[in-house]
Amino acid sequence: MKIMMWMIVFITWILAVYAPIQIRGEVKDPTALDDQVENGLNDQILTEYEAFYIYDHIASYLSRPEVGLSGFAKFFRESANEELEHARKFSEFVNKRNSKVVLKNILLASSGVPMDFKNIHEVIDTAIRKELQVTAHINELHKLASQMNDAITQDFLDDFLQEQVNSVSKLREMRARLHLDNSAVYLMDKEFR
């Protein structure tokens, strides 16, 4: 009799807990991305791939025998690989949030990046502009995630924002050092090898 009584209590408890879920339908997934945030993350993936493409283009340019700045080329090849890794991290994040990665076309020709550069100063200025663009986009995405109460995405973006600050600072320091004297280009190129 006691066993029967406990079974009735247990079945009643199960129905009380699980029946409302069935009545109300599917429970909202708190890890799901808002459509606007998902679109913003996909745009950021494109931005990261564009940065990769630009830095790889710069590295190829600097590697030319007539340019001869293999140290700077190495620096920009490493920077390109960093941007590629960022794109992959954003893709993984979108997938983990049960959303879809939508890859878009990379158009270097319409990005305003020259095929050849006048000097290393123009290269550094191009890189700074790109890093500022990447930073601005991540800031906007962070703001959007905040408006959508998406703390998970905000937390994910925080490390990228700090890394952007460091990248821009390093490029600005490089630009300043290059203006010190005529041998700065040679010395910095040697430093990066």
Where are the predicted features?
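Iron-associated oxidoreductase/ferritin-like identity signal
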Residues: 2-193
